Structure formats: C-alpha cells, structure tokens
C-alpha cells in the first residue's frame, strides 16, 4: 500500500511539472498575417508552386522567429499565411525583404509572381508595427483579438 501511495504521489508531481512546461510554451504575442494574392499574368501553376516552395524555404532558413509560413490555393487566388512570434519578428521580416536586406532579391522575385490584394493581420499589433508597415504601401487591415491562445 505504501508503494502504491508513493507511486501515485510521484505521478501527481510529474503531471504537475508537465503542466507547467505547457504553460510556458504559450506565445501570447503571436501575430498571424493572411495575405490574399493573385498570381501575375504569365505565371503557370507549376511556376507558382515552385516559387512558393523556394520562398518558404528562404523564410525558414533566415527567420527563426517566423513561427509558420504557407502558400495555399484559394480558387483563382493564393492565400499566404504568415505566423510571427511577435511584432519584432514581423518587423525583422520587413527589414529582411527591404532594400539591402538578406531577402531583398527573393522579395523582388515574390513581387514578380504575385499581386497582393490585401493583408489581414490577426492579433494585437502595436502602434509601432502599424507605423512600420505604412511605407510598404500595401493594404493592411488589423484585427485585434478578443480572446486567443497560441502554443509555442
């Protein structure tokens, strides 16, 4: 009986420690960008797929605080979903694709493949981020969260 109680106590302690680990892995400042685009005239579906993989790989390699990245078919449009750890991670992405940034060439190619129709931003974006994106001249729409969670 004593061994059984010891075992149950041990399991209880371990489960509490695991619970704390999962709480620590929440990302409370995550931002999600949903970019609606059209493929540019003259670009085949195969070219779009190949470039999408190329660009996704470049982001994965160069931006450790980009939590996720994916291009998706949406009828005659393309949806790009970008997930960022926080405002700073997104602003770093903006700097990376800007003139002189490590992804400048890739972004020029991006704009050769796609026309951006709108960018919906989900999460609590700071005023600093909202000001940062203005010079890009793209149609950003910000949507603050009422309630959300994101795991690490």
Predicted regions and their residues:
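Short S/T/G/P-rich N-terminal loop/turn motif that feeds into the first structured element of a domain
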Residues: 16-78, 85-95, 112-152
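Mid-chain, well-packed structural core segment of small domains
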Residues: 92, 98-110
């Amino acid at each position: 009986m004593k061994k059984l109680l010891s075992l149950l106590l041990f399991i209880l302690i371990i489960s509490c420690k695991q619970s704390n680990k999962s709480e620590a892995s929440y990302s409370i400042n995550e931002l999600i960008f949903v970019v609606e685009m059209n493929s540019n005239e003259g670009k085949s579906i195969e070219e779009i797929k190949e470039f999408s993989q190329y660009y996704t790989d470049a982001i994965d390699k160069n931006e450790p605080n980009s939590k996720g990245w994916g291009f998706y078919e949406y009828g005659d449009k393309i949806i790009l979903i970008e997930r960022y750890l926080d405002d700073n991670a997104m602003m770093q992405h903006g700097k990376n694709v800007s003139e002189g940034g490590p992804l400048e060439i890739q972004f020029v190619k991006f704009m050769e493949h796609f026309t951006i129709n709108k960018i919906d931003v989900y999460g609590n974006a700071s005023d600093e981020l909202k000001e940062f994106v203005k010079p890009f001249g793209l149609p950003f729409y910000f949507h603050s969260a009422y309630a959300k969670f994101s795991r690490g």
